């Protein structure tokens, strides 16, 4: 793709998200979503092949359906409230339809079907954008309308997402699909706390983006897309492979790594609000996520058959992929837990 064309498309996608995040007018929010959608399709198909085209088509159809539902909810709300501003959703039907549309855009269960397939069919860079930047716009709208959301619907979707995110990743050997199911589970944790403490949702999103960014950058540095290719990199880049596994354990929420922070704080906040069954169920379901990350780490590092490196002088060549801020991201993705007492004051 021409660099100028790619820069223009990327700028449009960023502008669309920024319009959604900064607008208080429903029509501008819808326009921002459409700008972002039309610009992100060529980014998903940057390396043109049938799989990328299929993934981009699935993404477009899902997001277009969600946008249609969103506009329907906006019009219903306009009929009852006679205003375009995001203050309160006055009609229960509009609230349910709007929540469904935003859940579909985020890839939460039961509308999660597109996330693993789309992520698997696109390159690692596009997958990184899809699982991080593309979550910001719908989550910012959910953040703004949190007081008007149907609580039962949101909690059901959150619990299902945590369950699907853990259950779906159990049999996967593709790293991109594992990251997709991890994303579904993390989105479930964020929406579970949204109505109780929106600030904690924002903090959870920040930590999730940081960990996902680190993991994808390490995948790109190591050129790994499957668990088999990851296990074969031990004798070539043992340090990077070890860091990938530690970061993935952090994504699973293993203490004392950074990924444990959001789970700890969310369970604590839900318990403060006299909710016992919900956090208990979430913690049990989160063990599924941690299990497949632990199994991946075990199978990749401890059960690998001894092999020699047949690629001579591999260590003498300088890696052309320069990622200068990766060490900082790795430290923040794994060692933030001591800062939890400070973060707990951000209510």
Curated annotation (Swiss-Prot):
Topological type in the membrane: Multi-pass membrane protein
TM stretches of this protein: 1-21, 25-45, 60-80, 89-109, 111-131, 149-169, 178-198, 201-221, 242-262, 274-294, 323-343
GO biological process: mitochondrial electron transport, NADH to ubiquinone; mitochondrial respiratory chain complex I assembly
Reactions catalysed according to its record: a ubiquinone + NADH + 5 H(+)(in) = a ubiquinol + NAD(+) + 4 H(+)(out)
Entry's localization field: Mitochondrion inner membrane
Secretion signal, residue range per the UniProt entry: none
Keywords recorded for this protein, A-Z: Electron transport, Membrane, Mitochondrion, Mitochondrion inner membrane, NAD, Respiratory chain, Translocase, Transmembrane, Transmembrane helix, Transport, Ubiquinone
Major enzyme class: translocase
GO cellular component: mitochondrial inner membrane
InterPro entries per record: Complex_I_Subunit_2, NADH_DH_su2_C, NADH_UbQ_OxRdtase_chain2, ND/Mrp_TM
EC number: 7.1.1.2
Major localisation: mitochondrion
A GO MF label: NADH dehydrogenase (ubiquinone) activity
Pfam families found in the cross-reference section: NADH_dehy_S2_C, Proton_antipo_M
Function: Core subunit of the mitochondrial membrane respiratory chain NADH dehydrogenase (Complex I) which catalyzes electron transfer from NADH through the respiratory chain, using ubiquinone as an electron acceptor. Essential for the catalytic activity and assembly of complex I.
Annotated family: Belongs to the complex I subunit 2 family.
Description of how the protein assembles with itself and partners: Core subunit of respiratory chain NADH dehydrogenase (Complex I) which is composed of 45 different subunits. Interacts with TMEM242.
Protein name, entry field: NADH-ubiquinone oxidoreductase chain 2
Organism phylogeny: Eukaryota, Metazoa, Chordata, Craniata, Vertebrata
């Amino acid at each position: 793709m021409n660099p100028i064309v790619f820069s223009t498309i990327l700028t449009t996608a960023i502008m669309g998200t920024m319009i959604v995040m900064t607008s208080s007018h429903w029509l501008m929010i819808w326009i921002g979503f459409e700008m972002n959608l039309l610009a992100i399709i060529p980014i998903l198909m940057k390396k043109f092949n049938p799989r990328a085209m299929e993934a981009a088509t699935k993404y477009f159809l899902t997001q277009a359906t969600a946008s249609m539902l969103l506009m329907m909810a906006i019009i219903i709300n306009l009929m009852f409230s006679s205003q375009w501003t995001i203050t309160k959703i006055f009609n229960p039907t509009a609230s349910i339809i709007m929540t469904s549309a935003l859940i579909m855009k985020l890839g939460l269960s039961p509308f999660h079907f597109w996330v693993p397939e789309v992520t698997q069919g696109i390159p690692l860079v596009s997958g990184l954008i899809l699982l991080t930047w593309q979550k910001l716009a719908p989550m910012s709208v959910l953040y703004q309308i949190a007081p008007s959301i149907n609580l039962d619907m949101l909690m059901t979707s959150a619990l299902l997402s945590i369950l699907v995110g853990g259950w779906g990743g159990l049999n996967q050997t593709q790293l991109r699909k594992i990251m997709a199911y991890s994303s579904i589970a993390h989105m479930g944790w964020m929406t579970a706390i949204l109505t109780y403490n929106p600030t904690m949702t924002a903090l959870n999103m920040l930590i999730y983006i940081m960990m996902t960014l680190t993991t994808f950058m390490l995948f790109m540095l190591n050129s790994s897309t499957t668990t088999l290719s990851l296990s074969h990199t031990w004798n070539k880049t043992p340090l990077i492979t070890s860091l990938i596994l530690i970061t993935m354990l952090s994504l699973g929420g293993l203490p004392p790594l950074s990924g444990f922070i959001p789970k700890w704080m969310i369970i604590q906040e839900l318990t403060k609000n006299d909710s016992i069954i919900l956090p208990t169920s979430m913690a049990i379901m989160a063990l599924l996520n941690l299990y497949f990350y632990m199994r991946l780490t075990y199978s990749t590092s401890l059960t690998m058959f001894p092999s020699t490196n047949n690629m001579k002088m591999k260590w003498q060549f300088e890696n052309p992929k320069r990622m200068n801020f990766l060490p900082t991201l790795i430290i923040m993705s794994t060692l933030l837990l001591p800062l939890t007492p400070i973060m707990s004051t951000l209510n």
